[in-house]
Amino acid sequence: MRATPWLVLTLLSGFSSPLPAMDDLYDLARGYAAAHGAGHGAVPSYARQTGLACSACHYQFLTLTPFGREFKLNGYVLTNRPLITEKDSTNGGSLDLSPASLVSAMLTASMTHLNDALPDTQNDAVALPQELSVFLAGQISSKVGIFSQLTYAGPDGSFGIDNVDLRYANHTSGDTPVVYGVTLNNSPSVQDLWNTTPVWGFPFIGTDAAPGPAASPILDDAFAQNALGLGAYTMINGLIYGEFSVYRSAIQGQAAPDAESGAIDGVAPYWRLALQKEFGHTYLMLGTYGMHASVFPDVLSGPTNAYTDIGVDAQFETPVGGGEIVARGTWLHEDQTLDATFDAGDANSANNDLSTLRFNASYYPNQRFGLTAGYFQTTGSTDTGLYPVDPVEGSANGSPKTTGFIGEVDYDPWENVRLGLQYTGYGNFNGGSTDYDGSGRDASDNNTLLLFAWLAF
């Protein structure tokens, strides 16, 4: 399922603070709300719990402010509301419970127009809902919080578990503030604080009615909702962030991974390191992240396919003309040792590589309008076994090269409602600009216009 609902992360999560510095964080949130004119916004349960509108945590959803990142870092438990508590009871029990409901929902609807309709399908496909999600999120105890999502996906009629991130967060006292915690989650990078890594990167919404490129690194959602990750993280002095996690296959709908599930051999390590700094009102983050996974493609013994992904990313934020510019970029390189696929005759070479580049910038003049433009590129080894000739989704020359741009205009009549128009244009698709699939389809035939509505409540 396409991961979309970062907004609801802050709209619906209840919090209680383990931090003595809670007053400072709340003052920061009120400052962001005031700066973005959000004093009287009517929003879902995040506002009910804190008295703050979406703009405390988002320039516009889904793009987080510094306070939004603090909220997630501290385990979804920050609040300024009184809790239902019991301390040192006679039977040894204790309780810290948010009085607010932790239930919220999200609905998206869309219309998709392709430059040239797919064979034997109707163009201008409409979806209502495209996705319908229910969220259970917020404070579990004073130091434990959760974000969890159940999603009905209209295009395939399925309903199941979506993103989950369960966190424990605490801090140390002293001259150098340190936040540390543990995350238990089901999608690599769902726990990330920035809008550069795969789960929360732009575009924040897409469509299943348009074809997608044949190749992407494993970190681009290959294990989304089908792996269980356990990791530890820390933020030192608000400057250096580090995380190390390990993932093991946890296939939805299976009690244990079977031979055809693409199970991880053992565990797959994931790492994250970032340096952030504010220069006056300007913010900059530089980071790196990566993962190594050995996967059984068809059987649970014998040769595996090994993937090593290493990425670098950056995020830049600065006020301009009463609004905000946010720029995000990432480059992710993957080395592939495909012993299992090569032995099965499905790859021409056992050693391949793949690289993706994504860069985009948004301008938010106020809380109602947003403009975003981005560029994307995928390149890699030519291999007619991995990328064979096939109508629409194949490659005539065995190359994964795909290039293009995305533009999006958003109008938010309320902070929890969005009407958007998104256009994706391709210069290359699966290795070519003309007749890329060997069946006469051009890259520009896949150019896509997406009209959508997005509500969180």
Predicted regions mapped to residue ranges:
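The canonical Cys-X-X-Cys-His
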Residues: 51-61
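Detector for outer-membrane/organellar transmembrane beta-barrel domains
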Residues: 281-407, 411, 423
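C-terminal beta-signal and adjacent terminal beta-strands/loops
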Residues: 415-419, 423-442
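Outer-membrane beta-barrel "beta-signal"
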Residues: 53, 417, 443-457
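Outer membrane beta-barrel
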Residues: 62-66, 98-114, 119-252, 265-281, ...
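Outer-membrane beta-barrel and related beta-rich outer-membrane complex signature
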Residues: 192-200, 254-256, 298-300, 339-343, ...
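Post-cleavage N-terminal segment of exported redox proteins
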Residues: 1-40, 63-106, 278, 297-298, ...
